[in-house]
Every structure is written in structure tokens, then in C-alpha cells.
Amino acid sequence: MKNNIITPRYNLEGVFLRQIHSFVCRKGRTTTSQLSAIKKYWSLIGVDFQLNALNFSSIFKHRAPIILEIGFGSGESLVKTAMNFPDKNFLGIEVYKSGIGSCLHYASSYQIQNLRIIYYDATEVMYNMIPDDTLSKVQIFFPDPWHKKRHHKRRLLKNIFLKIITKKLIIDGILHIATDSESYAFYILDEIKDIKNYKNLSEKNNFVKRPVSRIITKFEKKGLLQGKKIFDLMFQLKK
């Protein structure tokens, strides 16, 4: 397992180029059990970052529709979803080592066979590793909203990234986003409105009800208890 989660960029003179990311590499505590899970199970479930496209048949035992989840947090809901849909293959991307360790722990406990995870920046994974026209669904649940206006440049779900996703989805594939930030929800609607390939599956062209397939996370439960409203956005890729 590689410890770097971004690819450093340099100019022709060898000077490091500062990049804007949708995450901050916080020095959060990775527990002993999480580190142990990484050591034991990464070789079984983890996929190292590479600069060329993945061959999905080489990382999954069975051929099946592929669902990509970006930013799976602890991985508990991702693992449960993979258990609920054994006829699908799941690929998760996460930038925090604690989340990687936690997900590996859950997956190994339930002996999940249809899940693989990547420890790297999602933008670079999408650019380099995900072949075009291969994903049946992309799900991004509770991405960092970066509330302050000066931090909006860090938001993952900008127009350029949403366009990248259109290249990776199959026709009629689904993009499903959930957020507890109303301002971010409307920001996403604004960023995606000019991308003609996306069809909003909401009757009112805004939000949909939470589908039963999306498991309510601990983070979401906490927000609901605090009176927060959850916004589900769902789009289908059309020709």
C-alpha cells in the first residue's frame, strides 16, 4: 500500500506546483486496529494507484455492473451496500487512512468478495484509472461542502469534475449525490445544469427522495437528530 495520495506536479524547471484539492491531509489518528486491518487485508481488497486504466476483470472475481463510491468515510455503509447487492461490483475511493483501515476491517469481518478500494485522490483516480464507459453508477455521499466562499474552489463537485464523470458512466448510468448542505445542493444543481448529457431524475428538476438502496449513515443520523435536512440528487446519463 502506497502512503502518498496525490501525484506531485512540477514545472519544467523542477519547481513544485501547488495544487488545489477537495480535501486536507489532516493528521488524524489511525487506530491500532485500523493499521492492523491495512496490514492484513490491503493485498486482498486494496488496489494501488496507477497511471494507466484498470482492467476490472483482473480485480473482481465475477463480471458485474460496477458501482463507484467516492469518499466512503468509515466504509460501513459501503460494505453493507455491497452485501445487499452481491450481483454488483463496488469500487470505493478514500483519501483518509483511518477510513481505509476501518473499511478493510468491516469488509474482512463479513468476507466481502465484491468490493475493492483505492487509497488516493479521487480526481486523479478518475483521470487515470477508470476506463471510459464502464461505470453503471457513481455515488458521492456527503462530500465536504467547504462552506466558506473562499474555499469553494476546493469543492469536489464542480462543473469540470461532473463532466469527467459523464465520460466514465455507461449510457443510462446514474450519478447519485447526497448532502446535508442546502447551499452545496443548489451549487451542484447550478454546476450541472449546462451539462446536457445529464437528466435530473427529480420531477421538479431538483431533489429526489432517498432511495432505499442508500443506507443511512451514522453521520446522517447525527445530522437528522440535529434537525438537518438531507438532499438527494440523482442524474441519469443520456446520449
Curated annotation (Swiss-Prot):
> By its UniProt entry, which InterPro entries does this protein fall under?
SAM-dependent_MTases_sf (IPR029063), tRNA_(Gua-N-7)_MeTrfase_Trmb (IPR003358), tRNA_methyltr_TrmB_bact (IPR055361)
One GO CC annotation, please? Answer: tRNA methyltransferase complex
Give the UniProt keywords, A-Z.
Methyltransferase, S-adenosyl-L-methionine, Transferase, tRNA processing
Annotated binding of substrate, by residue? K148, D180, T217, K218, F219, E220
Give the residues the record marks as binding S-adenosyl-L-methionine. E69, E94, D121, D144
Q: Which pathway or pathways does this protein act in? A: tRNA modification; N(7)-methylguanine-tRNA biosynthesis
Q: Which reaction does it catalyse?
A: guanosine(46) in tRNA + S-adenosyl-L-methionine = N(7)-methylguanosine(46) in tRNA + S-adenosyl-L-homocysteine
| Enzyme Commission code | 2.1.1.33
The entry's active site is D144
Here the disulfide bonds are none
Any Pfam family from its record, for instance, is Methyltransf_4
Q: Name one GO molecular function term.
A: tRNA (guanine(46)-N7)-methyltransferase activity
Give the PROSITE patterns listed for this entry: SAM_MT_TRMB (PS51625)
Function text: Catalyzes the formation of N(7)-methylguanine at position 46 (m7G46) in tRNA.
Q: Which family does it belong to?
A: Belongs to the class I-like SAM-binding methyltransferase superfamily. TrmB family.
How does the annotation summarize its subunit structure? Monomer.
Matching entries from HAMAP family are given as: tRNA_methyltr_TrmB
Put simply, this protein is called tRNA (guanine-N(7)-)-methyltransferase
- Taxonomic placement: Bacteria, Pseudomonadati, Pseudomonadota, Gammaproteobacteria, Enterobacterales
Q: Name the gene.
A: trmB
